[in-house]
């Protein structure tokens, strides 16, 4: 059963500006493991990566119904990729499956998250 759906879209140029003006922005958004992956990317891909992770984490928090803040922070959410490159979020609840999709265009990054309860 679906228990939450979230979506978020961000403008790449705004993320690029934040990354340039506020170096701590990246540290605030990415977990340590995500930051390791980030360091391996080209400049253009770094912007897309941060924007995509930001959008996915916001979408996840929206699907939870809480938003980013008191109950969940950016560092509570880690997005990994499977062997085929498909992104996934590990839910702290063993009772849930989290589906995530991240996409980029020339100007935007967008993410959608669906949280599914496994037990009834």
Curated annotation (Swiss-Prot):
Instruction: Tell me which family the UniProt entry assigns to this protein.
Output: Belongs to the P-Pant transferase superfamily. AcpS family.
Q: Where does Mg(2+) bind?
A: 8, 58
Source organism of the structure: Anoxybacillus flavithermus (strain DSM 21510 / WK1)
Indicate what this protein is called per its UniProt record. Answer: Holo-[acyl-carrier-protein] synthase
User: Pfam families under this entry?
Assistant: ACPS
Instruction: Give the reactions, separated by semicolons, that this protein catalyses.
Output: apo-[ACP] + CoA = holo-[ACP] + adenosine 3',5'-bisphosphate + H(+)
Which keywords annotate this record? Cytoplasm, Fatty acid biosynthesis, Fatty acid metabolism, Lipid biosynthesis, Lipid metabolism, Magnesium, Metal-binding, Transferase
Task: Give the subcellular location.
Answer: Cytoplasm
> Which SUPFAM superfamilies does this one have?
4'-phosphopantetheinyl transferase
A biological-process GO annotation: lysine biosynthetic process via aminoadipic acid
Question: What is one GO cellular-component annotation here?
Answer: cytosol
GO MF term set: holo-[acyl-carrier-protein] synthase activity; magnesium ion binding
What are its cofactors?
A: Mg(2+)
| Its job | Transfers the 4'-phosphopantetheine moiety from coenzyme A to a Ser of acyl-carrier-protein.
The protein's Enzyme Commission number:
2.7.8.7
Major location, coarse class?
cytoplasm
């Amino acid at each position: 059963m679906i228990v939450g759906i979230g979506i978020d879209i961000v403008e790449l140029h705004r993320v690029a500006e934040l990354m340039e003006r506020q170096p701590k922005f990246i540290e605030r958004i990415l977990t340590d493991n995500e930051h390791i992956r980030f360091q391996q990317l080209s400049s253009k891909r770094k912007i897309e990566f941060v924007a995509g992770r930001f959008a996915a984490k916001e979408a996840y928090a929206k699907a939870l119904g809480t938003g980013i803040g008191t109950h969940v922070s950016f560092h509570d959410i880690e997005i990994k990729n499977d062997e085929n490159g498909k992104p996934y979020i590990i839910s702290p609840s063993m009772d849930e499956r989290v589906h995530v999709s991240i996409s980029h265009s020339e100007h935007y990054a967008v993410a959608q998250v669906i949280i599914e309860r496994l037990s009834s």
